[in-house]
A protein has these predicted regions:
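Short amphipathic alpha-helical segments at helix-loop
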Residues: 151, 189-190, 267
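Generic alpha-helical propensity signal that fires on short helical segments
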Residues: 61, 65, 69, 188, ...
Length: 356
């Protein structure tokens, strides 16, 4: 089992399985127990399994608009086109019609992602063979330019919910790995992109606590500003990554996935000042919401541990609140990662019981 930027690749699977609960199903058990030496192989294995399951259910189809010149009417007659045909002495009708088709955006994204993985030399032959077999059922589906995919416009509904995890894996793959060469070809770069891994890291922590600690209220909630006059024009939204609460006890976790957990100035290591300012602001404004009630609101900056020699491990008492700065070592067997996360809860919420 190898590492990708100090994260065991199989641990990335565990992180994905919390972010996307579909991967917790028994049908993915063989992927969960396999040891991966490349991130590309993990992604290929997940997609091969997921696409296979989707094929058993049937590929999603939707109505696609077409315009064709036909000898018999289909759908609606397009008058301008038909008149033009008459003037050119063509005995055909221009027709507009909708056709139920597999050649839609969701299937195009799957095929495009698979084709990128098939062209990558680091993907093992067994995964490529599996993906190639799946692609035989995509003969009527077009590949598209990866850079032209408008992820924010994709909408899921009741009859295509099974695509949600697959498309998310595709987005993670394409956005995190895609580089265009001068020749206009695409190649896959290092998987770990800080910004995208940070989102996965946040989601993983949130979903882990949500699943295993039902006694706690777990959310990524917004905190209102403690305003004296109620005027908050142009103030930024205070959006927490992880907000844990039981009664009047609150822990706000700010999850950070950085290449460097500290900043260096004149050979002196210090904590990232913006991160400290942010968590302190969150804590004090959250505490204000309790009014005159007794409360304990704490904050924690939780960095993904790097290979740097100096790692933060600090607890501060600031203006009546505890602010801690810790690291989560993702380069360990997953059971030990879980133990680290459990200790965080146990140190802030007495008597809390973990659920399986």
């Amino acid at each position: 089992m190898t590492k990708d930027k100090s994260i065991l690749i199989n641990n990335i699977y565990h992180m994905l399985s919390y972010a996307f609960q579909t991967l917790k199903q028994e049908t993915y058990d063989d992927v969960a127990v396999e040891s991966f030496d490349e991130m590309y192989n993990l992604l290929a294995a997940i997609l091969a399994k997921g696409i296979g399951l989707q094929l058993k259910q049937g590929l999603y189809r939707e109505y696609i608009s077409h315009q064709e010149e036909l000898t018999v009417m289909r759908g609606k007659i397009n008058m301008p086109g038909t008149i033009k045909n008459k003037l050119l002495h063509k005995q055909v009708l221009t027709c507009d019609f909708d056709e139920l088709s597999e050649n839609n955006m969701l299937n195009q994204i799957l095929k495009t992602t698979v084709m990128l993985l098939l062209r990558n030399g680091k993907v093992k032959a067994k995964y490529k063979d599996d993906l190639k077999k799946k692609m035989l059922y995509f003969s009527n589906v077009d590949s598209i330019e990866p850079t032209e995919i408008k992820w924010s416009l994709i909408r899921f509904q009741r009859n295509n919910q099974t695509y949600r995890m697959l498309v998310s894996i595709c987005q993670l793959t394409i956005e995190g790995m895609l580089i265009t060469t001068d020749a206009g070809n695409y190649r896959l770069a290092s998987f770990v992109d800080e910004q995208r891994m940070c989102r996965l890291y946040e989601k993983f922590i949130l979903e882990y606590y949500s699943r295993h600690y039902p006694e706690l209220s777990v959310s990524a909630s917004q905190i209102p500003w403690a305003l004296d006059d109620g005027v908050g024009t142009m103030l930024p939204v205070m959006q927490t990554d992880i907000h844990l609460q039981r009664g009047n006890t609150v822990l706000i976790i700010d999850a950070k996935y950085y290449s460097h957990t500290t900043q260096v100035h004149f050979d002196k290591h210090t904590l990232h000042s913006n991160n400290l300012y942010q968590i302190f602001t969150y804590v004090k404004n959250r505490s204000y919401q309790f009014g005159e009630e007794d409360n304990t609101v704490s904050g924690m900056i939780l960095y993904a541990k790097t290979e740097e020699e100096i790692q933060p491990d600090n607890v501060y008492q600031m203006h009546g609140s505890q602010i801690s700065v810790k690291t989560l070592d993702l380069n360990l067997p997953f059971v030990e990662i879980a133990a680290q996360m459990d200790r965080i809860v146990e140190s802030h919420f007495t008597g809390v019981i973990k659920a399986d």
